[in-house]
Amino acid sequence: MKMKTFIFADKFFLKSDVKGPGYLEITDGIFGNYTKDEPQGDVKIIREEGKWIAPGLVDTHIHGYMNHDVMDNDAEGIKVMSEGLLSCGVTSFLPTTLTSSKERLTDVARTIGQVYQEVPGAKIQGIYFEGPFFTEEHKGAQNPSYFGDPDLDTFHEWQEASGGIIKKIALAPERNGVKEFVETVTDEGVVVALGHSNATLEEADVAVEAGASVFVHAYNGMRGLNHREPG
């Protein structure tokens, strides 16, 4: 019979509660039952006094880390990011692009698609395309030279280059063609976010009804609020 393993720590962030100090069972690398009482018998106890144990963090919007940028298009840089993030408690992430040329974004998507299963630390769960379908009024750090309306053919080229791992894309809902674009890519399993936008409430509603489900840079990269026009 395989020896049971438990980890002791001061605090555990469980599914619906925070408990501790206590012991958490580990079976084949997976967390099991929690108990406040010290396990007895033939068991292995890993002691982490003074430590907190929590599920790994998921970073869904990250452009770079450890002096590396996703838009550098550097496979080794992506690996360095992965290692660095794991040391911060992040166990999975979505490398995030910036607005750039169609060709550059294709290259970046391809590079991440080729390396994502080889990273040594935090796992890559997909790619987040932040842009280029934004508007200039709230461009932030995005380059408006490459802004344009959502284009399914272009997006599918990026998706093909990535090997199908683009999982999220942000756009401005006032751009032409948004409704069809959102409906299509959400049906394909891609999460659509709204951001860097000067849309009215009505324009945003169209995108939400079409399937958009995330808001990016709320209250700073968006139209201002007014008591007669809620933005």
Give the role of each language-model region.
Residues 135-163:
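Conserved phosphate-binding/catalytic loop of the ribokinase/pfkB sugar-kinase fold
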Residues 63, 79-108, 122-135, 162-174, ...:
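Divalent metal-dependent hydrolysis catalytic cores, especially in the metallo-beta-lactamase
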Residues 64-76, 141-148, 191-195:
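Active-site mouth loops of central-metabolism enzymes
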Residues 1-40:
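N-terminal metal-binding scaffold of metallo-dependent hydrolase/deaminase domains
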Residues 10, 24, 29, 50, ...:
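Divalent metal-coordination and catalytic microenvironments
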Residues 74-77, 108-111, 151-153, 228-231:
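Charged helix-capping and loop-helix junction motifs
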Residues 160-231:
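Active-site core of metal-dependent hydrolases
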